[in-house]
């Protein structure tokens, strides 16, 4: 961390609900956690100053304000926006991490711009080729991490192994699992299943000798059954799965609402089952894990949903603080270093095996 006090730069501009909702979320996070941490609120001073005063945020001495005059909108092209809006709240927040003023950046803004800005400005860790976006997914018996859900749609097989390290460390922090069991998403659980990317990655996982607690392939049919703590996939597949899941939940809610409104008997039934619905909400960690970290960078970048409300912003701040306090970045670097040592050892063993084979062939000849 930049110092002994964890510091988060929060970009309060560019979200669907506007800066006020995010500022209220910051206030809720400060109210629920009285420990020693800092929040730098980044945004257009003319817009955010009245809101900070209205909601008594500046009375907390853990809050600082950083002025940024521009906003990257949701529909802007990421690279073009980065070049033309150099004083955007998002890029200024990332820069605060780059120079060491903050340890993490949290934003609800343009996902592409956040990923591009984070990757270009902060760079990937040594040994990590591409960052990956990880998120907590609710399961039938327990929650699990899915990674990657959108950062790298067409990765190399080696990157999927890297993603397992990133996801396992996030599972340790977010879910409290000491030795997360990792599965590789495929179209079946048999060793012969999967495309060339999955097949090659599957072989690499088997050869990594214990750095990752690898359990094998998992298919979509068993995704939510709790067999694995981390599910690894490419960013294209992960994004499709995530959006399909969100769409399915929304469809279920809409259909349920329509059916309830058909009869007063159904409405009465909902009142009777109110306790069950409250318990269902507790099992779905929408607010608690609303921030998805972009893992593998030299600095923590956390993406919250564009329509995140105040509770979800407070939850995203909470999980970001947990990542910082648990020294997740350092743990990732250590595991990546261990993995690379094993990879080099395996290569050397293979070269030695080939050399001996060649010598035996020459002797026989």
Enumerate the language-model features and the residues they cover:
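Glycine-rich phosphate/diphosphate-binding loop of Rossmann-like nucleotide-binding domains
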Residues: 17-21, 33-40, 49, 58, ...
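A glycine- and small-aliphatic-rich helix-loop capping segment at beta-alpha/alpha-beta transitions
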Residues: 25-29, 57, 113, 117-134, ...
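Phosphate/nucleotide-donor binding subsite
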Residues: 57-102
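Glycine-rich phosphate/nucleotide-binding loop
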Residues: 119-146, 227-231, 235-345, 352-353
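Short glycine/serine/threonine-rich phosphate/pyrophosphate-binding segments
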Residues: 18-22, 48, 86-100, 104-118, ...
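Short beta-strand segments
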Residues: 11, 41-43, 66, 107-109, ...
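N-terminal phosphate-binding or glycine-rich loops at protein starts, especially the Walker A/P-loop
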Residues: 1-49
